[in-house]
């Protein structure tokens, strides 16, 4: 499994909004400058996030985007699944409703299941609030 640029940038975009969660809208242009990602590409990503109800769009001269909820209410897993779809490494562990006909006799199923559980466990345990805190700690520790 490889996370696409879209998924990585969606997490960065949401983190940027969380870092600038002051009650005022943040423009795509400002996010683009800070993240080094084209505003056109960010507009495509923010559209997906907006349709899913993750962000609120504010129109007008002082317009931009804001998180709809508190940063602690978004996990990295939520953002990645929205932009990437399933994070399962193989199809046989992709859906709980799907029963693999070889599951009982397939030793490798155990590997894929453990890998899937590990991936989901990690991305579902990290919130935007966690990332904000980590980013602030990294910034505090950065000394020239």
Each model region followed by its residue ranges:
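Alpha-helical residues within the helix-turn-helix
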Residues: 33, 50-51
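Residue cluster at the C-terminal edge of the helix-turn-helix DNA-binding motif
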Residues: 51-54, 82
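Beta-hairpin "wing" of winged helix-turn-helix
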Residues: 54-62, 66-67
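N-terminal helix-turn-helix DNA-binding core of bacterial DNA-binding proteins
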Residues: 5, 9-11, 15-37, 56
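Short, hydrophobic-biased segments on the C-terminal half of alpha helices
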Residues: 46-47
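C-terminal regulatory/oligomerization modules of transcriptional regulators
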Residues: 76, 94-144
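Key DNA-contact positions within bacterial/archaeal DNA-binding proteins
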Residues: 40
